[in-house]
Amino acid sequence: MLKSKGKKGGESMTKKVIKGRSYDKEYINQLEWLKEKGVWDKNPRTVYEDGNKAYSKRGFDHTILINKGTIPVMFSKRLYFKDAVKELLWIWQQRSNKVSDLQEMGCKVWDEWEKEDGTIGNAYGAQLAREVDDTGMNQVDNLIHKLKTDRDSRRHIVTLWDISSGHEMALKPCVYETQWVVLDDELYLKVITRSTDSALGEPYNTWQYWVLLQLIAHETGLEPGGLAFSMAIPHYYDRHETEIERQIEYYKKNKDRIDNEEVVVGIDLSKGFYGFTADDIKIKDYAQRDDIPKRKFEIAI
């Protein structure tokens, strides 16, 4: 495993305050597009906990761009940002597929998919742990190494998709690939998903990969650029539609306030990628606020 090294130059380089606007506008626009243009599926694989089929309204090929000055946090729906970071670290930092490792961090988002052996099968972290042929490193260390030594390469790709072991996975990866691009010492990230639960997964994943971009950029001596979150099949489920309509309406009623809200993120990068924890990132005054709606969406399995 590569050793993490913080940038030289003291605390100012490793403890950052990042300010920007929320991405409510982009997110709500996507929900409205999906509501208007989406098509209901007819024979879904997914079911709710009660055994009923979970029908989804689906669209095709939508990308949300998170440019500099935008932070993927919302005020029309509360984001549980600590759990999202814990899951990210479980996959990318620990490269684990053991559900107990995530539970030890106080996060239970994978409990429904735990197999008899206590894992989620050969998925997510297990794929990142695989060795890359030309370096013998795991996929994460290989990415960090190549971004330091071959920045202009157009092959900085990390993949979670494996056609040889998909049958062993509790859930085939939704986010299945990332591509990293360096432009003028800035690091850009494209995230590709095969399937995106727009109500539950998308806000969670967009925040995760924005955080990952900050971490990998710092680890490789680059400045974070933009994030493109590309969804092949964005969708929401039938039991999500009413709450989605409430969220859209809430945003429209509070648009002026929400669009002018400033998001302030504090992130401590001093311990490097492998020392970073969920406690090293905070959204100023976010968790304490009672005017950010908590929205409940049933999980489809």
Where are these regions (language model features)?
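Terminal, non-catalytic protein-protein interaction segments that mediate quaternary/complex assembly
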Residues: L2-I301
